[in-house]
Amino acid sequence: MVLIRVLVNFLILQLSYAQKSSELVIGGDECNINEHRFLALLYSERFQCGGTLINEEWVLTAAHCDMRNMYIYLGVHNVSVQYDDEQRRYPKKKYFRLSSRNYNQWDKDIMLIRLNRPLRNSAHIAPLSLPSNPPSVGSVCRIMGWGTITSPQVTFPDVLHCANINIFDYEVCRAAYPELPATRRTLCAGILEGGKDSCNGDSGGPLICNGQFQGIAYWGADTCAQPREPGLYTKVFDYIDWIQSIIAGNTAVTCPP
């Protein structure tokens, strides 16, 4: 049994308070407040996800993060603190791969959101460019989110947390999860000995490798950060043509197959 990493029945104003801990994201540290200017917080009354600002009007996240009455916050670090340059938007339009909400747990878990109006760059808000190349196996990558810092029991922090993990060959994830198809549009990333991982509530957030936005968190084992059970991330590089075409106004584009 595995789970999609989105939190259900989450109330953003009722986050469980987490004592200061060395286990952040799971196994990381509090993020530097200046390292996540592109990070979006998506929420409604029932769900929480992350997202990535790729220009002043567009956010990229996971398709399973689609929710009614969604609000999108930029410039957030501690959810209990309102920052001077914090900005809130809502979706003007949502785009799914192959027009589809028919993504499955293995494939096409990507959603592009056009905001109702452009954001203003500020000290804590700025977009992150799409990748120029795919990541290499062995790359050290950064994950971040407001998801649970404990698993399987959940504890939701006020402050954003980050951790470093590694890109593995896709076959490492196929060995861990035999039901995975042979697709290569998914990145396999984690720590083989366990201890660091994205988890419930981190869905849709970025995987950043060598400063480039390479993946979107979407799937993992029921209990996070277990040995030899890496997480799965939508491979952003494989969807660049689709993303750029949508932004340019070609909403009928379908790529890759």
UniProtKB/Swiss-Prot annotation:
Query: Which residue positions are annotated as catalytic?
Result: 64 (charge relay system), 109 (charge relay system), 203 (charge relay system)
Gene Ontology annotations of biological process type: proteolysis
Keywords attached to this Swiss-Prot or TrEMBL record, sorted alphabetically, are:
Disulfide bond, Glycoprotein, Hemostasis impairing toxin, Hydrolase, Protease, Secreted, Serine protease, Signal, Toxin, Zymogen
**Domain of life assignment:** Eukaryota
User: Which residue positions carry a glycan here?
Assistant: 78
Q: EC number(s) in its UniProt entry?
A: 3.4.21.-
Q: Where is the signal peptide?
A: 1-18
Which residues are connected by disulfide bridges in this protein? 31-162, 49-65, 141-209, 173-188, 199-224
Q: Name one GO cellular component term.
A: secretory granule
Q: Where does this polypeptide localize?
A: Secreted
Tissue specificity comment: Expressed by the venom gland.
Q: Which PROSITE patterns match?
A: TRYPSIN_DOM, TRYPSIN_HIS, TRYPSIN_SER
Is Glycoprotein one of the keywords UniProt gives this record? Answer: yes
Q: Which residues form the propeptide?
A: 19-24
The record's listing under Pfam families reads: Trypsin
Q: Which CDD domains match?
A: Tryp_SPc (cd00190)
One GO molecular function term?
toxin activity
Concerning Gene3D superfamilies, the annotation shows: Trypsin-like serine proteases
Q: Fetch the SUPFAM superfamilies from UniProt.
A: Trypsin-like serine proteases
What biological function has been recorded for the protein in this entry?
Answer: Snake venom serine protease that may act in the hemostasis system of the prey.
* Protein name stated in the entry: Snake venom serine protease salmonase
Q: Which organism is it from?
A: Gloydius brevicauda (Korean slamosa snake)
Q: What is the lineage of its organism?
A: Eukaryota, Metazoa, Chordata, Craniata, Vertebrata
